[in-house]
């Protein structure tokens, strides 16, 4: 395989490691590194070989084609899209027309014969690996070609030639210029690998870090049916999974969140073999769309491999994987440094200050907001229509589009998931993108003004009109010490990993209502009595509960995922989860809810909180919440999760709810379980010592306490100006509660809106000796720093 005793033209993966990047590029060096070092640790990589940078440079040198290439590039205006396209096409044709040197062709022939082992049906993947590719500060995502299901030596040779030419794709030329790479300093290596038969199973991409927030305690996995190109290109909306690393390391169930993608199409082997037609795209049968493309066990196994790879490289990694449909075995087919989050950024908080009509929604990429004029682009020929500040709307972006993507204020696509090329490039460029909207190109019209928001969690929204938004930047490394803990109020698990990156000392209020409303959306009684519902409602519920075995499991499973996400995001800090505090009108708004809820004149003071939990009409619904908490604490081991009981009206009710929790397997003190009570009714403060006999502490709910102390309806605009937590009567009640808790040596914090809105109120609470303030995430840093100033 050597060239007359000089440097080799072809090397096997098991001869390679990361010190060979300059010889075979980042992608091939990484595959060799894993085969050499991680095979014995459960990481499986298909065998293969790589042509070297020397082979590529000799190929260009032999005919003088390199001189023509660099002369043409030097006089091409890269920012002129048509000039770039013309030059790129000319260079690629020159390369394809240039024959391989005989030494290289013979070296590839020898390696191919050994790799195929005379198997006539063997199929191969031929991939590019650039010598500057996958450096931690430059994502060359998808800038060179990949050929799949290549069969026969002649076809492999043609594919290698096309891979060589792909170093001069328009997008690769543009990218090198903008990243400051010299064309002359970059060479290309072709990797030839045995194919994993994922056309008969599933494949996808995973990151050893959360791609949106940079939170590093989870593995993020995407998966769809068939060959992985559909996920990488963004042609499908894949399934998504988050796996918590510490829970995985403890040998416990560690999947904290699952989202089912539509997975409408897949790439499979084509029956007839022609160059460029080795694969075809087909529709996925409905029954396969409606199930997850990986089992929970496979998700955990992939996550273990991701952790092994990350630990070996000592940095966050971006990994492509494939499942073999014949054997069921999981393989790693690529691994490279994760490039966006590993750069480190100043913390930015985008906040939308208005709500408009929602035109489209999909998966949010990043956390930014952009606004501009819609340009619907149907194909690459329309690229020159994009002006700086436009919102690019298209079916799916190809990596060829990178030169125009950087002009856009935002990007919106019909197809794609959070690990596709469009997502990776959008993150790198710092442009908000909403992918996988389904029909954005039909719903959004050329010339209309829109706002694209990725600042509201996993779901990204496109709103009509240019809405007002702001951005705050902060780069606080260490926070000053305070005599109390600054915690956070969090309702949306989608934002948990993002919020966990803020300075914090845990979660003082995690609300279940958001999970029930957004992740479930069905009344628990309608699920427990599913067989009694009419056919239309049953069909609606079946559509909502795809991926779950039963209506009951849907409710418990989704609650478990939501609570586990919150617990994992802040682990090992305490996360106080308040059990459901919907009022009857809010429960009635859930699917199937009207049938089961009373009509109350004032639901705020009606059937809610602890009284609901112990009522015969709701006990078995409450049991579903308890089951979810038990799974999170006992099965997953997230014992940092504590529970909080809202709206406990009487001491007898306190006793009854503690007994009910024990009956449901949540016994105070068992497995370290702490049960906190919301102190939000004047009776709670007046009889604080008696209530505290049944609980491990208080969390003050200043919203309800204020309205009940002052006799106000906080939802009424007529009396809203009188609502003030700083009123002396309210403060007197809070002082009573704080003193009682201190006297018994029990926890007392606050999770109401007051300290987030009024820094003077927060300062008063600190002087009163409160153990913790739980604030809205957007006020944490400012309030923390302000209180520290007061203590100086």
Regions found by a protein language model. Name each.
Residues 138, 148-149, 159-160, 202-211, ...:
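Beta-strand scaffold of nucleotide-dependent catalytic cores
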Residues 66, 338-343, 347, 360-364, ...:
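Acidic, glycine-rich flexible loop/linker segments
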Residues 142, 314-339:
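Conserved metal-phosphate-binding beta-hairpin within the catalytic cores
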Residues 218-318, 323-324, 363-370, 388, ...:
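Conserved catalytic alpha/beta cores of large enzymes that bind or transform nucleotide phosphates
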Residues 1-191, 200, 286-297, 302-305, ...:
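N-terminal beta-alpha lobe that positions the nucleotide/phosphoryl donor
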Residues 214, 450, 704:
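Small/polar (Gly/Ser/Thr/Ala-rich) solvent-exposed segments
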Residues 112, 120-125, 130-140, 144-148, ...:
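Conserved alpha/beta-domain cores
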